[in-house]
Amino acid sequence: MQDLQRYVNEILKESGNKRVFSFEFEGRKFWLKRVEKVIKGGILTKIFKPDPYRSFAAEIKKLEILNAANAPAAKLALKGEDFFVIEDAGEPISRLFKKSEDENFKREILNEAARALAGLHALNFAHGRPALRDLAYKNGEIKFLDFESKFFSDDLELKKCRDLLVFIHELFRQQASNELVTSAVSEYVSAGGEKIRSRSLELTQKFRFLYYLLLPFKFLNKKDLTAAIRTFEYLLPIVKTKK
Protein backbone atom coordinates (compact mmCIF):
# COMPACT_ATOMS: atom_id res chain seq x y z
CA MET A 1 0.00 0.00 0.00
CA GLN A 2 2.83 2.41 0.85
CA ASP A 3 4.47 1.70 -2.52
CA LEU A 4 1.19 2.46 -4.29
CA GLN A 5 0.81 5.66 -2.24
CA ARG A 6 4.28 6.83 -3.24
CA TYR A 7 3.62 6.04 -6.88
CA VAL A 8 0.31 7.91 -6.82
CA ASN A 9 1.96 10.92 -5.20
CA GLU A 10 4.37 11.06 -8.13
CA ILE A 11 1.78 10.72 -10.88
CA LEU A 12 -0.42 13.35 -9.21
CA LYS A 13 2.43 15.81 -9.67
CA GLU A 14 2.84 14.84 -13.32
CA SER A 15 -0.80 14.53 -14.42
CA GLY A 16 -1.61 18.23 -14.71
CA ASN A 17 -5.32 19.00 -14.52
CA LYS A 18 -6.60 15.53 -15.45
CA ARG A 19 -9.53 14.59 -13.20
CA VAL A 20 -9.92 10.94 -14.19
CA PHE A 21 -7.22 8.76 -15.69
CA SER A 22 -5.89 5.21 -15.60
CA PHE A 23 -2.42 3.99 -14.73
CA GLU A 24 -0.61 0.70 -14.20
CA PHE A 25 1.27 -0.33 -11.09
CA GLU A 26 3.03 -3.66 -10.63
CA GLY A 27 1.19 -5.12 -13.62
CA ARG A 28 -2.27 -4.06 -12.44
CA LYS A 29 -4.50 -1.35 -13.85
CA PHE A 30 -6.04 1.32 -11.64
CA TRP A 31 -8.18 4.43 -12.09
CA LEU A 32 -7.59 7.69 -10.26
CA LYS A 33 -10.29 10.29 -9.77
CA ARG A 34 -9.79 13.79 -8.39
CA VAL A 35 -12.26 16.15 -6.78
CA GLU A 36 -13.83 18.71 -9.12
CA LYS A 37 -12.20 21.85 -7.73
CA VAL A 38 -13.47 24.16 -10.48
CA ILE A 39 -17.23 24.00 -11.03
CA LYS A 40 -18.03 24.53 -14.69
CA GLY A 41 -21.21 26.20 -15.90
CA GLY A 42 -23.18 29.37 -15.30
CA ILE A 43 -23.76 31.25 -12.08
CA LEU A 44 -26.83 29.16 -11.15
CA THR A 45 -24.87 25.93 -11.59
CA LYS A 46 -22.15 27.25 -9.32
CA ILE A 47 -24.68 28.36 -6.69
CA PHE A 48 -26.82 25.23 -6.56
CA LYS A 49 -24.29 22.48 -7.29
CA PRO A 50 -23.35 20.61 -4.07
CA ASP A 51 -20.03 21.35 -2.42
CA PRO A 52 -17.52 19.30 -4.47
CA TYR A 53 -15.49 18.17 -1.46
CA ARG A 54 -18.59 17.00 0.39
CA SER A 55 -19.85 15.14 -2.68
CA PHE A 56 -16.42 13.61 -3.19
CA ALA A 57 -16.23 12.44 0.44
CA ALA A 58 -19.70 10.89 0.04
CA GLU A 59 -18.53 9.05 -3.08
CA ILE A 60 -15.60 7.57 -1.16
CA LYS A 61 -17.91 6.62 1.72
CA LYS A 62 -20.21 4.76 -0.68
CA LEU A 63 -17.30 2.72 -1.99
CA GLU A 64 -16.13 1.89 1.54
CA ILE A 65 -19.62 0.72 2.54
CA LEU A 66 -20.06 -1.33 -0.63
CA ASN A 67 -16.61 -2.91 -0.33
CA ALA A 68 -17.19 -3.78 3.34
CA ALA A 69 -20.39 -5.60 2.32
CA ASN A 70 -18.58 -7.40 -0.52
CA ALA A 71 -21.03 -5.84 -2.97
CA PRO A 72 -20.41 -6.02 -6.74
CA ALA A 73 -18.75 -2.60 -6.90
CA ALA A 74 -15.35 -1.26 -7.89
CA LYS A 75 -12.77 -1.84 -5.15
CA LEU A 76 -11.29 1.21 -3.44
CA ALA A 77 -7.50 0.87 -3.37
CA LEU A 78 -6.41 4.24 -2.00
CA LYS A 79 -7.96 7.50 -0.88
CA GLY A 80 -6.93 11.03 -0.06
CA GLU A 81 -8.65 14.31 0.71
CA ASP A 82 -8.98 15.23 -2.95
CA PHE A 83 -8.53 11.94 -4.81
CA PHE A 84 -9.22 8.23 -4.70
CA VAL A 85 -7.95 5.20 -6.60
CA ILE A 86 -10.00 2.16 -7.59
CA GLU A 87 -8.93 -1.12 -9.12
CA ASP A 88 -9.83 -1.48 -12.77
CA ALA A 89 -13.19 -3.27 -13.02
CA GLY A 90 -12.98 -4.18 -16.68
CA GLU A 91 -14.68 -3.14 -19.89
CA PRO A 92 -18.13 -1.49 -19.87
CA ILE A 93 -20.88 -3.94 -20.80
CA SER A 94 -22.30 -1.39 -23.23
CA ARG A 95 -19.10 -1.63 -25.28
CA LEU A 96 -18.99 -5.42 -25.15
CA PHE A 97 -22.64 -5.62 -26.19
CA LYS A 98 -22.16 -3.28 -29.15
CA LYS A 99 -18.99 -4.98 -30.38
CA SER A 100 -20.35 -8.53 -30.31
CA GLU A 101 -22.47 -10.12 -33.01
CA ASP A 102 -22.79 -13.35 -31.01
CA GLU A 103 -26.32 -13.56 -29.58
CA ASN A 104 -25.29 -16.24 -27.10
CA PHE A 105 -22.54 -13.99 -25.73
CA LYS A 106 -24.98 -11.06 -25.51
CA ARG A 107 -27.44 -13.23 -23.60
CA GLU A 108 -24.72 -14.44 -21.25
CA ILE A 109 -23.38 -10.96 -20.47
CA LEU A 110 -26.86 -9.48 -19.90
CA ASN A 111 -27.82 -12.42 -17.69
CA GLU A 112 -24.64 -11.85 -15.67
CA ALA A 113 -25.58 -8.19 -15.31
CA ALA A 114 -29.09 -9.10 -14.15
CA ARG A 115 -27.71 -11.51 -11.55
CA ALA A 116 -25.30 -8.84 -10.35
CA LEU A 117 -28.17 -6.38 -9.97
CA ALA A 118 -30.16 -8.93 -7.97
CA GLY A 119 -27.07 -9.56 -5.83
CA LEU A 120 -26.68 -5.84 -5.17
CA HIS A 121 -30.35 -5.62 -4.18
CA ALA A 122 -30.05 -8.69 -1.93
CA LEU A 123 -27.43 -6.78 0.05
CA ASN A 124 -29.93 -3.92 0.41
CA PHE A 125 -28.20 -1.51 -1.92
CA ALA A 126 -29.53 0.24 -5.00
CA HIS A 127 -27.49 1.76 -7.80
CA GLY A 128 -29.84 4.51 -8.94
CA ARG A 129 -29.08 4.37 -12.65
CA PRO A 130 -27.77 0.97 -13.81
CA ALA A 131 -26.97 1.88 -17.40
CA LEU A 132 -24.79 -0.67 -19.18
CA ARG A 133 -21.95 1.85 -19.34
CA ASP A 134 -21.93 1.79 -15.51
CA LEU A 135 -21.45 -1.98 -15.37
CA ALA A 136 -18.00 -3.41 -16.04
CA TYR A 137 -17.01 -6.99 -16.85
CA LYS A 138 -13.68 -8.60 -16.02
CA ASN A 139 -12.61 -12.18 -15.31
CA GLY A 140 -16.21 -13.39 -15.25
CA GLU A 141 -17.36 -10.77 -12.73
CA ILE A 142 -19.66 -7.75 -13.02
CA LYS A 143 -18.90 -4.60 -11.04
CA PHE A 144 -21.09 -1.50 -10.73
CA LEU A 145 -19.60 1.97 -11.19
CA ASP A 146 -20.77 5.54 -10.46
CA PHE A 147 -23.51 4.97 -7.92
CA GLU A 148 -26.19 7.67 -7.80
CA SER A 149 -25.62 10.64 -5.51
CA LYS A 150 -28.76 9.88 -3.46
CA PHE A 151 -27.24 6.61 -2.28
CA PHE A 152 -28.30 7.11 1.35
CA SER A 153 -31.92 8.17 0.72
CA ASP A 154 -35.01 6.38 2.04
CA ASP A 155 -37.52 3.99 0.41
CA LEU A 156 -35.00 1.38 -0.65
CA GLU A 157 -37.62 -0.90 -2.21
CA LEU A 158 -38.78 1.87 -4.53
CA LYS A 159 -35.16 2.56 -5.50
CA LYS A 160 -34.67 -1.14 -6.30
CA CYS A 161 -37.77 -1.02 -8.54
CA ARG A 162 -36.37 2.03 -10.25
CA ASP A 163 -33.12 0.13 -10.81
CA LEU A 164 -34.93 -2.75 -12.46
CA LEU A 165 -37.07 -0.50 -14.67
CA VAL A 166 -34.06 1.61 -15.68
CA PHE A 167 -32.16 -1.60 -16.42
CA ILE A 168 -34.94 -2.88 -18.70
CA HIS A 169 -35.18 0.53 -20.39
CA GLU A 170 -31.41 0.46 -20.90
CA LEU A 171 -31.57 -2.97 -22.55
CA PHE A 172 -34.12 -1.67 -25.03
CA ARG A 173 -32.03 1.48 -25.46
CA GLN A 174 -29.17 -0.78 -26.54
CA GLN A 175 -31.62 -2.40 -28.98
CA ALA A 176 -31.75 -5.76 -27.22
CA SER A 177 -34.44 -8.12 -28.47
CA ASN A 178 -37.47 -9.04 -26.36
CA GLU A 179 -35.97 -12.50 -26.00
CA LEU A 180 -32.75 -11.13 -24.50
CA VAL A 181 -34.71 -8.88 -22.14
CA THR A 182 -36.92 -11.77 -21.04
CA SER A 183 -33.86 -13.91 -20.37
CA ALA A 184 -32.21 -11.17 -18.29
CA VAL A 185 -35.35 -10.45 -16.26
CA SER A 186 -35.81 -14.18 -15.63
CA GLU A 187 -32.24 -14.34 -14.30
CA TYR A 188 -32.96 -11.39 -12.02
CA VAL A 189 -36.07 -13.12 -10.66
CA SER A 190 -34.26 -16.45 -10.23
CA ALA A 191 -31.55 -14.67 -8.25
CA GLY A 192 -34.07 -13.45 -5.68
CA GLY A 193 -35.72 -10.51 -7.43
CA GLU A 194 -39.34 -11.70 -7.68
CA LYS A 195 -40.65 -9.24 -5.08
CA ILE A 196 -39.04 -6.28 -6.81
CA ARG A 197 -40.24 -7.43 -10.21
CA SER A 198 -43.82 -7.69 -8.92
CA ARG A 199 -43.67 -4.22 -7.39
CA SER A 200 -42.15 -2.88 -10.61
CA LEU A 201 -45.08 -4.29 -12.59
CA GLU A 202 -47.45 -2.51 -10.20
CA LEU A 203 -45.62 0.75 -10.84
CA THR A 204 -45.79 0.16 -14.58
CA GLN A 205 -49.55 -0.24 -14.32
CA LYS A 206 -49.85 2.85 -12.12
CA PHE A 207 -47.95 5.01 -14.60
CA ARG A 208 -49.25 3.42 -17.80
CA PHE A 209 -50.78 6.79 -18.77
CA LEU A 210 -47.23 7.87 -19.64
CA TYR A 211 -47.20 5.29 -22.41
CA TYR A 212 -50.20 6.91 -24.07
CA LEU A 213 -48.61 10.34 -23.69
CA LEU A 214 -45.38 9.17 -25.28
CA LEU A 215 -46.83 7.02 -28.07
CA PRO A 216 -47.86 9.90 -30.41
CA PHE A 217 -44.22 11.03 -30.49
CA LYS A 218 -42.83 7.64 -31.51
CA PHE A 219 -42.25 8.94 -35.04
CA LEU A 220 -39.48 11.19 -33.70
CA ASN A 221 -37.37 8.03 -33.38
CA LYS A 222 -35.39 9.33 -30.39
CA LYS A 223 -33.34 6.68 -28.63
CA ASP A 224 -34.58 7.23 -25.06
CA LEU A 225 -38.16 7.82 -26.17
CA THR A 226 -38.25 4.66 -28.28
CA ALA A 227 -36.75 2.65 -25.41
CA ALA A 228 -39.37 4.00 -22.99
CA ILE A 229 -42.19 3.04 -25.36
CA ARG A 230 -40.70 -0.43 -25.88
CA THR A 231 -40.39 -0.84 -22.10
CA PHE A 232 -44.09 -0.14 -21.63
CA GLU A 233 -45.03 -2.36 -24.58
CA TYR A 234 -42.97 -5.16 -23.08
CA LEU A 235 -44.21 -4.83 -19.48
CA LEU A 236 -47.89 -3.90 -19.84
CA PRO A 237 -48.93 -7.27 -21.39
CA ILE A 238 -47.14 -9.00 -18.49
CA VAL A 239 -49.13 -6.84 -16.06
CA LYS A 240 -52.37 -8.04 -17.67
CA THR A 241 -51.42 -11.70 -17.26
CA LYS A 242 -50.80 -11.12 -13.54
CA LYS A 243 -54.32 -9.81 -12.88
Positions of predicted regions on the chain:
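ATP-binding glycine-rich loop module of kinase domains
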Residues: 10-11, 16-56
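The N-lobe alphaC helix and its flanking beta3-alphaC-beta4 segment of protein kinase-like domains
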Residues: 49-69
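Conserved structural core of kinase catalytic domains
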Residues: 52-55, 73-110
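Conserved hydrophobic alpha-helix
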Residues: 66, 117-123
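Catalytic-loop of the protein kinase fold
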Residues: 122-132
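Conserved protein kinase catalytic/activation segment
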Residues: 134-144
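C-lobe/activation-segment region of protein kinase-like
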Residues: 143, 147-243
